[in-house]
Structures are given as C-alpha cells and as structure tokens.
Amino acid sequence: IQAPYSASLSLRYYRLVIAATDDQAVNQAVFEACEADNVLVNSVDDPPHCRFMVPAIIDRSPLVVSIATNGASPVLSRQIRTQLEASIPHGMGKLADFSGKWRSTVKAKIMNPDERRIFWEELYASPLKEQVFNNNLAEADQLITQALTQWEKPKGEVYLVGAGPGDPELLTLKALRLMQQADVVIYDRLVSAPIMELCRRDAEKIYVGKARSNHSVPQDGINALLVKYASEGKRVCRLKGGDPFIFGRGGEEIQELFAAGVAFQVVPGIT
C-alpha cells in the first residue's frame, strides 16, 4: 500500500503486514492495529514493533536454511548467509528430493532408527551424492539399491579423541567430525563445556571425571564402558582433555579394546 497510513484502513483481512516506514509513530499505529486484529506484523528495523522476523535465506528447495539475529543485526545475518552459500552446493536440493523418494523404502528395510541414521550418513559420504548433484539419477538409484542389499548391522567403534586445552577452535577437524557422529560420549573432568556443546545433541553423555583421590569411575570401569557400548554396535567417543596419551591412560584403553576385538581410532589433541 503506497499511501499514508490511516487508522480507518482495515488490516483484519491481511495475514501478514510489513510496515516499511522510518516513522516510529506510524510503525506503532500499524503495530497496534495488527495486534488488535491478530495479524502478524513486521516493522522494518524496528524490532519492538515486530511479531515476526524476516531471516536471511539460503534456498536449496526443498532444503531451506534461515539465519536470523532476532532483529539485532540484519547485516550480520546477510554476511553469515554469504559465507554459508559457498559451503552448501546447489545440488543439495536435488539430494533432499532424492532422499525423500527413497525414505519409505529405506525405513521398511532398516527398521532400527539409529541404524537407519547411520545408513544415511554413510550414503551421504559416498559417491552417490555427486551422482545426484550431476543428475545421474539412474546411477544413484543403483548405488542406493546396492547399499540396501549389502546392508549389515553396523559394528561398534571407539574414538579416542583429544579435546585439547579447552578452546573449541583448537579441535582438529577429524575430532569434531567424530564427536558429532558418536552415539555415546564418555568424557573426563578436563573437557570444557564449550567442547561438550559441539558433541551430537542426542548422544548419551557419561561423565567419568577424575581428581586426585576421587575417581568418579575407576579406569577399569571406563575400559568396561568402552567395550560394553561398542559391543552393542554403538559409536563411542572417549573424549579426553589435552591428548589421549600425554598424562592420560589412552594406552590402557587401547589394550582393552584390542583384547576385546573392538575397532578404534585415535585422534591426537593439542596439549
């Protein structure tokens, strides 16, 4: 509506209103009128008179990513969007469509939700993704069919990860990747809260912190936990402050895993 605002203008028939003025009194009047009629309203650059925000959008339909600062800094939202645009391939929308087409078939074949999540994670890390990006959908169909035919219950594995001195920016890329895919995280006293925030949100987290003459879980108990969860087919992240082997007992844990036939990886940390 390109006209001066008047209180006689009824907004009740609109679902959404944007007040694009630089007059706070007008914004206030539009806001109050919308509030009275239960209409969503956004006043540009005037957060107190907003009932919704307009985020910066990365559109890879059906995949959509939105970035917002709750009106605090739209410029920052756009800057972050620009950074993310470069890291999200344009073919991601095709991959989402492809996944949706196969979702029911995969669910019928792999009924356990944790195993199904692992299947999709492994599939997205395989050559299938590039086939979909390049519109080679027949080849992609063959790859997922083959993956379903050859699917076996995943075997457990342990990741001995050094969390470094506590600064999340000092984590290695591999450490971060394994932390975010682990089903169980067993961590000690020296692992900082910001580091723990980077672990997978729904992972089971078990504290086994040690202080002098006060071990919440003795080393034998920690070894047993690692073997137990890995034997259940879970991916276990043993997260240690610093490096797993410097002032740590990673060597003992490896011996126990080796004796039990459990696969493991070691990721050094900055000390």
What is each of the regions a protein language model found here?
Residues 71-152:
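An accessory alpha-helical subdomain
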Residues 37-52, 90-96, 256-271:
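Short, acidic/small-residue loops that bind anionic groups at enzyme active sites
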Residues 166-168, 173-178:
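Cofactor-pocket helix-loop regions in the catalytic cores of large enzyme subunits
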Residues 53-57, 149-150, 174-175, 227:
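A generic local secondary-structure boundary/capping motif
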